[in-house]
Swiss-Prot record:
Residues 33-305 are annotated as: Disordered. It comes from the Bacteria. The keyword Nucleotide-binding applies. Residues 416-588 form the tr-type G domain. GTP binds at residues 425-432, 475-479, 529-532. Residues 295-304 have a biased composition (Basic residues). Residues 425-432 are annotated as: G1. Residues 450-454 are annotated as: G2. The keyword Nucleotide-binding applies. NCBIfam families: IF-2, small_GTP. This is Translation initiation factor IF-2.
Length: 920
């Protein structure tokens, strides 16, 4: 049939039920679901052959020539008419050539012979062949004698062809050899042409016919030159034999070749043994060797199963994604889905769809936080490893053949350097006063509110055992908002001095300083300060610090405790001696001064006249004027270096703190400083760090909107936008972290849209006007016409000099932005005793006030049998003895109307008012 047949159509045609046919198809490995499923043409042909052979009648032998009657189900009308001829005339025969084989009439054959045995063709046929059909006479041509046409043979049961000779087979002979089929009684002997070899009764083929191939003639094809008739006649002497079955392609069982010719040939168009000269024969299956025509047709079940197992695993929503085997994927902070897709060779759109199905709405180029990347990776069986900032920076420097944190050269190049000491402790415990006493200076008076809000770095010359020694001191803030500054100070130090007030004891920032020092693995010297004050108890301090692992030497520990008074200058020399002894005993303080300088930016600020200024502590190497430097995302060339006394420095050795002028922008506090060969390399490193920092900040600040809380996300929320300006980078960073840590309520949100170092400029005012933001100036003022522009645009600028004042006021502003919360306050209750109906105002309730007061325009609810009938009502009118009143007290009768008419006697009216409640 021209198109694909359906199962129920084939079942009706073959005379079986659809259920039986479905079972047969499933046994053969076909993918069918119901009686409406379609069946390919080769499968339908196989089914017709199978069920047709079962229902074919038994063959009946003819009395004259031994030919059998054709089966009624498959014989064509022309073949049936030829078989019914009573006295067929013998066909005219040309003289046979000596070398041509002479096929004999079909006769019963002996039991099957081995496959390797080559059967000998019998002499010329003595039985006459049936006459051809009148509609297509076969003219006699001079040439080889065509083989006789025996009568139609009984239709054989479908046999499995040999693998090597069947180009449509889906199996290979080396995998699963197929046994040779047994010969049938009345069939031609192997090696002889099969009777009735026409395209209508050829053996079944697993694959479909070639589209557009002409159908075979009824009665068999006309024999042509070279014996190209049914079964393949003899060829020319010395030439290749003819192939059988001109309408079939591929290497099948061909006819016998001529004497001295090639072996049995194949079908037309394929090298099958007896093809054109120069072509290789394809009889590999006959000799048990692999080869032959390429495999075609349907895939085997094993191939389909392997293909199914190798398919990409689907995830939620049916999106097909790569399925990993637990591989580790390294991604930078703030990576996008496009970066992830590039690592696993996937489509970014598929990752976007997969995240949407998981409840996250992210675009392909948007920075994604670490948790989302890890969640998506686990769905695809990947382990996502977000590269830490340290590893990321190390890989960046390695790409430029640079390294940080190691001394160049060998042991002979190292020289002794001064120790770096960080003074840490709780606020107001005397850290800056101790440094003032050591430096013989007054630093504390310059700090607003008497608390340190910067990191100061100083180098002090002291004397130990008659030898002058240098000590570098770093002063850190003690306020709770400066946690990041204390952590940076601990990382850049060799020894930590923990200052504890003898009259105050261990405080929260004291414990935090201990944790920073222990995390940085630096030794600690405890200075018990304010021993001159009343109530001072140094022994109590020693006992408290024992709980945190700082055990005094007099208690058998290894921590040195020194009782001092920074105000009186008591035991300051003993403290410095303890610092130097600890450095000599516990630390190897050496560095190579001859390499390119490396250090850390302690703090940075923007100076009006000098530009960006960074306080840098040199850790190794020597920094000179003119060096190309990079610190974080800032780069430049050293134009000038100044020490803590304001004097110019040409070269800064290890452990020397200096102020560096020449950066193009303000570096971040705690950024590593590195000297490179040229400005181009410094700019490239700074640009790549800036891009990474921007992506990481975008991923952190992106508010995750999931499908579950989409409704709440779409609700109107109050947002307070801030622009932060400060005198140095560390203070701005500390202020931002402190403000973002304020937790008020989900209804209000704090957002820092811009931050910077320096005074308030007109650009800041314009940005604040466009975004409805408030400008916070910390230790800075507005520049030029910025104040006039702010007044004209209505932009609020607030100035602060103490950090906790800014935190308190911003928190109060956030609380003021909260939506008000109302609390219900009951006013009174009244029982309806009578109902009066009026055509003007409706039902009037005559009530007796049982408790409280009834007030006009008050909120009310109607209760019936203690069940609320109506809510959110209003007392629209209130009368007492025909007079309008504003309220009626307990024990009096009144008449009132409600904004609800379905009232009954015995109902209770309860009035209340909503009082705004302060939110905290």
């Amino acid at each position: 049939m021209a198109g694909k047949a359906r199962v129920h159509e084939l079942a009706k045609e073959l005379g079986v039920t659809s259920k039986e046919l479905l079972a047969t198809l499933k046994e053969q490995g076909e993918f069918v679901k119901s009686a409406s499923s379609t069946v390919e043409a080769p499968v339908a042909r196989r089914l017709r052959e199978k069920f047709g052979s079962k229902s074919a009648p038994a063959p009946a032998k003819s009395a004259g020539n031994g030919a059998t009657a054709a089966p009624a189900t498959s014989a064509t009308p022309a073949t049936a008419a030829a078989a019914a001829a009573p006295a067929p005339a013998p066909a005219p025969q040309a003289p046979a050539k000596p070398a041509a084989p002479k096929p004999a009439a079909p006769q019963p054959v002996a039991p099957p012979q081995p496959a390797a045995a080559a059967p000998t063709p019998p002499p010329a046929a003595s039985a006459p062949a049936p006459a051809p059909a009148p509609s297509a006479p076969a003219p006699s041509r001079p040439g080889p004698t065509p083989g006789p046409r025996p009568g139609p043979a009984p239709k054989p049961a479908p046999r499995t062809p040999r693998v090597g000779n069947n180009p449509f087979s889906t199996q290979q002979p080396v995998d699963r050899p197929i046994p040779r089929p047994q010969p049938r009684p009345g069939a031609p002997r192997p090696g002889t042409p099969r009777p009735g070899m026409s395209p209508n009764n050829m053996p079944p083929r697993p694959a479909g016919p070639r589209p557009g191939a002409p159908a075979g003639r009824p009665g068999g094809p006309r024999p042509g030159p070279g014996g190209r008739g049914p079964g393949g006649g003899g060829g020319r002497p010395g030439g290749p034999g003819g192939g059988g079955g001109g309408n079939y392609r591929g290497g099948g069982a061909g006819g016998g070749g001529g004497a001295g010719g090639a072996a049995a040939g194949g079908f037309r168009g394929r090298p099958g043994g007896g093809g054109r000269p120069g072509q290789r024969g394809g009889a590999a299956g006959a000799f048990g060797r692999p080869g032959g025509a390429p495999k075609r047709g349907r895939k085997s079940k094993r191939a389909k199963r392997a293909e199914y197992e190798n398919m990409q695993a689907p995830v939620v929503g049916g999106v097909r994604l790569p399925h990993g085997n637990g591989e580790t994927i390294r991604l930078a902070r703030g990576a996008s889905l496009s970066d992830f897709a590039e690592k696993i060779n996937a489509n970014p759109a598929s990752l976007v769809q997969a995240l949407f199905n998981l409840g996250e709405m992210v675009t392909a180029t948007q920075s994604v936080n670490d948790e989302t990347l890890e969640l998506l990776g686990s769905e695809m069986n990947y382990v996502v490893q977000v590269v830490s900032p340290e590893d990321e920076d190390r890989e960046l420097l390695e790409s430029f053949d640079l390294s940080y944190g190691e001394d160049a050269g060998d042991e002979g190049d190292l020289e002794i350097r001064p120790p770096v000491v960080t003074v840490m402790g709780h606020v107001d415990h005397g850290k800056t006063r101790l440094l003032d006493t050591i430096r013989q200076a007054n630093v504390r008076e310059g700090e607003a509110g008497g608390i340190t809000q910067h990191i100061g770095a100083y180098q002090v010359l002291t004397e130990l055992d008659g030898n002058e020694r240098l000590i570098t001191f770093i002063d850190t803030p003690g306020h709770e908002a400066f946690t990041a500054m204390r952590a940076r100070g601990a990382k850049a130090t060799d020894i930590a001095i923990l200052v504890v007030a003898a009259d105050d004891g261990v405080m929260p920032q004291t414990v935090e300083a201990i944790n920073h020092a222990q995390a940085a693995d630096v030794p600690v010297v405890v200075a018990v300060n304010k021993i001159d004050k009343e109530g001072a108890d140094p022994q109590k301090i020693r006992g408290q610090l024992t709980e945190y692992g700082l055990i005094p030497e007099e208690y058998g520990g290894d921590t040195m405790f020194v009782d001092i008074s920074a105000k009186q200058g008591t035991n300051i020399d003993a403290l410095l001696e303890a610092v130097l002894l600890t450095a000599d005993a516990s630390l190897d303080l050496r560095a190579n001064p001859d390499m390119e300088a490396q250090g850390v930016a302690i703090e940075a600020h923007l100076d009006r006249g000098r530009g960006p200024v960074a306080t840098v502590l040199i850790q190794r190497g020597t920094l000179r004027v003119g060096d190309s430097i990079v610190a974080g995302d800032a780069y430049g060339r050293v134009r000038r270096m100044v020490d803590e006394h304001g004097e110019d420095v040409e070269a800064a050795m290890p452990s020397r703190p200096v102020q560096v002028i020449g950066f193009t922008s303000v570096p971040g506090a705690g950024d590593n400083l590195l000297v490179v060969d040229e400005d181009r390399i410094a700019r490239q490193i700074a640009d790549r760090r800036s891009a990474r920092k921007r992506n990481a900040l975008a991923a952190r600040s992106r508010k995750r909107i999931s499908l579950e809380d989409l409704d709440s996300a779409l609700k109107e929320t109050s947002q307070l936008n801030l622009i932060l300006k400060g005198d140095n980078a560390g203070t701005v960073e500390a202020l931002e972290e402190a403000l973002l840590g304020i937790q008020v309520d989900d209804e209000v949100e704090l957002r820092v849209i811009d931050r910077g170092v320096g005074g308030v400029t007109e650009t800041n005012v314009n940005l604040a006007s466009a975004s409805d933001a408030i400008i916070i100036g910390f230790n800075v003022r507005a520049e030029g016409k910025a104040t006039e522009l702010a007044n004209r645009e209505g932009v609020e600028i607030r100035y602060y000099s103490v950090i906790y004042q800014a935190i308190d006021e911003i928190e109060s502003a956030l609380k003021g932005m909260l939506k008000p919360v109302y609390e219900e306050k009951e006013l009174g209750r009244a029982e309806i005793r009578a109902i009066f109906r009026s055509s003007k105002v409706g039902n009037i309730a005559g009530c007796l006030v049982q408790s409280g007061i009834m007030r006009r325009n008050a909120k009310a609810r109607l209760l019936r049998d203690n069940v609320v009938v109506a809510e959110n009502l209003t007392v629209s009118s209130l009368r007492r003895e025909k007079e309008d009143v504003t309220e009626v007290r307990d024990g009096y009768e009144c008449g009132l109307t409600l904004t609800y008419s379905d009232i009954k006697e015995g109902d209770v009216i309860e009035t209340y008012e909503l009082v705004e409640k302060a939110r905290t």
